[in-house]
Structures are given as structure tokens and as C-alpha cells.
């Protein structure tokens, strides 16, 4: 059939509305939703005809496409996905998962009124930051603390407060890009601090900082390169040395440690990552870090340090523009409470638990998943193998965590097609593909995910 005839054969919306199945959907949904979905279905087939992708279709085809479109239009765009990649802090999949206590706290303050900015003791207006400041001080040892909506905002606010219109000295090797094309030099520019780069990419000495200090210097800045490592012929100035230099010239020292861990992972066999507590113990005046990376909480930028500097930041006009909402505060409070006892934090905060759980546990879990798949899914090959998980989220670069995975292949469908179908399924499952095999890393899977994975695999060849 020629293109013109195919276009003429496209049904009209009024015609489709008379179809029994469409009428049934019309009774259950708004007319606007049904008509919009019908229009999308007709437009889809018109486009396919114009592209010469089809040479025939039926009214039933158009109606079936309408049904799929309507269901998609009804569903929320923000979906739950199953993370089978083995990347624990997966930036694109929402980073850290919240602890149960944090989730319960969010629900409580979301479905009820709360004392967000109300002092129950005095019966007067209070500060939203008071709900978490004491907790942050307790778990970090800081004199004072405040929270904004993300770590880039924390860096910008701190720099704007400490050295607006003045110079911030930083090592050239620490001018990191923190993701999404957001770069430390750009954040500094918006803070209205003037960047002074010192040293080289791989080597910076104390004299590089000292030789650039002048009457217009506002802060000495150290940025932890949490999302990359420079190996080989390298040297950087320690926090202790910078604090001594800052004291000599009466300049504040600020450190952005990015991923913001409160746990010393070297105790558990990982490469040492600077903790918030260690930076403060070394005398750093202001430390900034993220809430949704190694901390395992909600997206937030946490600022800790000397009270005189934090108090100035609280009064900065930028603070209102950067403040966090009640749900984030509730989630952060619930997360921080877990850190009063490190053992409790590791047990209850999913990010920490996933990173620190032993591979032997995951071997048994991988074997269980493989058995369920083998017992319920035909025409696929499943095997358990050793592999490596990643921390992710721009944290612990180069660190790999021994794990066990289920590897999948089939003679009837390619690994790439399996990946696509799982990703586009009703319950999206995100996997890795390597050497013509689909990889399901159980480190980032929950037991509740196993049945869903089995059900979605059963649909792959239908």
C-alpha cells in the first residue's frame, strides 16, 4: 500500500472513541488523558508511515499502542529502579539509599505539621538548622555546623563568606570537576572569590602557597580529589602544614572533602579516605562535604568548623536561597542518629552496609538468585562468578570491592537486547553488559528484588 493511502487509513479520534475498549478506558480515566493518548498513538503511526518504516497497520494496532501510551502517561515519571550494576552510590540512580529511621522521620514530618522553625520550649520562632546542628557537632566534633542544599552550594557559601572580592589560594592539582560539568573554578567564580592557582598538576609545595599570600588573600583552600587519583611523581601539602601556614598569616583554612565520610574505611581494609573528624582534629577552620555520598543520607551540603565562621555564614543572604527543606532535614537527622554508634551506622545505613558487607555473604545470595532464575526461566544460561563492585558517586576512585555476580546469556537473544528489555520493563532493572553476558551484581540488590528479576526475565522471550 502506498504512503498516501496509509495516511488516509489512519483512524480519526472520534472514530476510535467509539471503540468498546477505548470507551472502557474513557470511563476509568479523564477524557483529556484518553484523547491525548489517542492523538499520540495516531501521531506515532503517522510518523512511522512518513519514515517508510511500515507498509501496513490495523485499527487494532493503533488501539494497542494507545493502551500502552495511556498507561505510560498515567505512570509517574520518577520511577523505582532495581540497581544490579554493583555501583553502590550510583549518581544516575539517586546515589545513597536512606536508612529506615531516616525514611520514617521524613514520613512523620511530611504528613504532619512540624516544629520546622518553631521553638517549642519558648513558643517563639526558631531555626531550622537547630534540629541537626547538635547532632552534626556530636558526630564530627565540630564547634558549629550548618546545612545547605548540596556540597557545591556549601563551597560557594563558605567562599563567599570568607573571601568575597578577595583571593582564595588553591593547588592546581585540586581544581576538580565534580560532575555534570560543575567545576571548582566555576563555583569559586560564582562565590565572587578570586582564584589563585599554585603549584602544578602533580606537585604542590608549601612555599607555593606562602609565596602567593598577600594583603588581599582571604582563605587557603584545600580540595580533596575524591573522584580521581594522581599516581607517581606527586606531592601535596598536608592539612597540618596548611593550618600552620594559615595561623602564621592569620588566614582561615578551608577544606572541601567532597564525599564526606565519617567512618575510617581503612579499618575495614580499604584505602584511607580523609574523614570529617580527622580534618577538624588537624585544625582546619571550615570543612564542607556531601550528605548523599559516603554519609549515606539525603542530598545536602554540610558545613562544619569554627563557630565564628559558621555564624557569619548563617547571616549571609545566600543562606536563604540555599537552605534545605523539612524533608531533607528530617532525612539527615535520621541518618546522623545512626552515627552515634558506628556499628549501628554500618548495620542500618544501606550505603555503608553495601560497601562493607563481605563477599561471602554475596556468594550465597548470588547462588540463591541463580537457583530462582534456573528454576523459573527457560532458554537462558546462568552462572555465579566472582567480580568487582564499585563505590561510585565520585568516591574512593580506583577502589574495587570483591563480590559475586550472576552472569546471564542466551542463544535466543543478545546481551544488549536483554539489557534494553530489562531497562524498559515495567520494573526497570539496570544491569551491566560485558563480553556478551548480562551481569547482575547482588551487592546492590535486595532480597525483595529477586522475585521481580525472575518475573521480568520470564517475559524477555515473549
UniProtKB/Swiss-Prot annotation:
Pathway: Aminoacyl-tRNA biosynthesis; selenocysteinyl-tRNA(Sec) biosynthesis; selenocysteinyl-tRNA(Sec) from L-seryl-tRNA(Sec) (bacterial route): step 1/1. It catalyses: L-seryl-tRNA(Sec) + selenophosphate + H(+) = L-selenocysteinyl-tRNA(Sec) + phosphate. Its EC number is 2.9.1.1. The modification N6-(pyridoxal phosphate)lysine is found at residue 293. Its cofactor is pyridoxal 5'-phosphate. SUPFAM superfamilies: PLP-dependent transferases. InterPro entries: PyrdxlP-dep_Trfase, PyrdxlP-dep_Trfase_major, SelA-like, SelA_trans, SelA_trans_N_dom. GO terms for biological process: conversion of seryl-tRNAsec to selenocys-tRNAsec; selenocysteine incorporation. It holds the Pfam family SelA. GO terms for molecular function: L-seryl-tRNA(Sec) selenium transferase activity. It is an enzyme of class 2 (transferase). It comes from the Bacteria. Gene3D superfamilies: 3.90.1150.180, Type I PLP-dependent aspartate aminotransferase-like (Major domain). It is found in: Cytoplasm. Keywords: Cytoplasm, Protein biosynthesis, Pyridoxal phosphate, Selenium, Transferase. One of its GO terms (cellular component) is cytoplasm. Converts seryl-tRNA(Sec) to selenocysteinyl-tRNA(Sec) required for selenoprotein biosynthesis. HAMAP family: SelA. Belongs to the SelA family. This is L-seryl-tRNA(Sec) selenium transferase.
Amino acid at each position: 500500500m502506498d504512503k498516501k493511502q496509509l495516511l488516509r487509513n489512519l483512524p480519526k479520534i472520534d472514530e476510535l472513541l467509539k471503540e468498546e475498549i477505548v470507551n472502557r478506558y474513557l470511563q476509568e480515566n479523564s477524557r483529556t488523558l484518553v484523547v491525548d493518548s489517542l492523538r499520540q498513538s495516531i501521531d506515532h503511526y503517522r510518523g512511522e508511515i512518513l519514515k517508510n518504516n511500515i507498509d501496513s497497520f490495523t485499527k487494532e494496532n493503533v488501539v494497542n499502542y494507545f493502551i500502552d501510551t495511556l498507561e505510560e502517561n498515567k505512570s509517574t515519571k520518577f520511577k523505582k529502579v532495581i540497581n544490579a550494576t554493583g555501583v553502590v552510590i550510583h549518581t544516575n540512580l539517586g546515589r545513597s539509599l536512606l536508612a529506615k529511621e531516616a525514611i520514617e522521620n521524613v514520613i512523620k514530618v511530611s504528613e504532619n505539621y512540624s516544629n520546622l522553625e518553631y521553638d517549642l520550649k519558648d513558643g517563639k520562632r526558631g531555626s531550622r538548622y537547630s534540629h541537626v546542628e547538635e547532632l552534626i557537632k556530636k558526630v564530627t566534633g565540630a564547634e558549629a555546623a550548618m546545612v545547605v542544599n548540596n556540597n557545591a552550594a556549601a563551597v560557594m557559601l563558605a567562599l563567599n563568606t570568607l573571601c568575597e572580592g578577595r583571593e582564595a589560594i588553591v593547588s592546581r592539582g585540586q581544581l576538580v570537576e565534580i560532575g555534570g560539568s560543575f567545576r571548582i573554578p566555576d563555583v569559586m567564580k560564582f562565590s565572587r572569590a578570586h582564584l589563585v592557582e599554585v603549584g602544578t598538576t602533580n606537585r604542590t609545595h608549601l612555599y607555593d602557597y606562602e609565596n602567593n599570600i598577600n594583603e588581599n588573600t582571604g582563605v587557603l583552600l584545600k580540595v580533596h580529589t575524591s573522584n580521581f587519583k594522581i599516581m607517581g611523581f606527586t606531592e601535596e601539602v598536608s592539612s597540618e602544614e596548611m593550618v600552620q601556614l594559615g595561623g602564621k598569616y592569620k588566614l582561615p583554612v578551608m577544606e572541601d572533602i567532597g564525599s564526606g565520610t565519617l567512618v575510617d574505611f581503612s579499618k575495614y581494609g580499604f584505602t584511607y579516605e580523609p574523614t570529617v573528624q580527622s580534618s577538624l582534629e588537624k585544625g582546619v577552620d571550615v570543612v564542607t562535604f556531601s550528605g548523599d555520598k559516603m554519609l549515606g543520607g539525603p542530598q545536602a551540603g554540610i558545613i562544619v568548623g569554627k563557630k565564628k565562621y559558621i555564624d557569619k555564614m548563617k547571616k549571609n543572604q545566600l543562606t536563604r536561597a540555599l537552605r534545605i527543606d523539612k524533608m531533607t532535614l528530617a532525612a539527615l537527622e535520621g541518618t546522623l542518629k545512626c552515627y552515634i554508634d558506628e556499628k549501628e551506622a554500618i548495620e542500618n545505613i544501606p550505603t555503608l552496609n553495601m560497601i562493607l558487607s563481605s563477599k561471602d555473604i554475596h556468594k550465597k545470595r548470588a547462588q540463591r538468585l541463580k537457583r530462582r532464575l534456573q528454576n523459573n526461566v527457560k532458554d537462558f544460561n546462568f552462572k555465579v562468578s566472582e567480580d568487582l563492585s564499585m563505590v561510585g558517586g565520585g568516591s574512593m576512585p580506583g577502589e574495587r570491592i570483591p563480590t559475586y555476580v550472576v552472569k546471564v546469556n542466551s542463544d535466543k537473544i543478545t546481551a544488549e537486547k536483554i539489557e534494553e528489555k530489562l531497562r524498559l520493563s515495567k520494573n526497570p532493572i539496570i544491569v551491566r553488559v560485558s563480553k556478551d553476558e548480562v551481569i547482575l551484581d547482588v551487592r546492590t540488590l535486595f532480597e525483595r528484588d529477586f522475585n521481580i528479576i525472575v518475573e521480568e526475565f520470564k517475559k524477555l522471550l515473549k
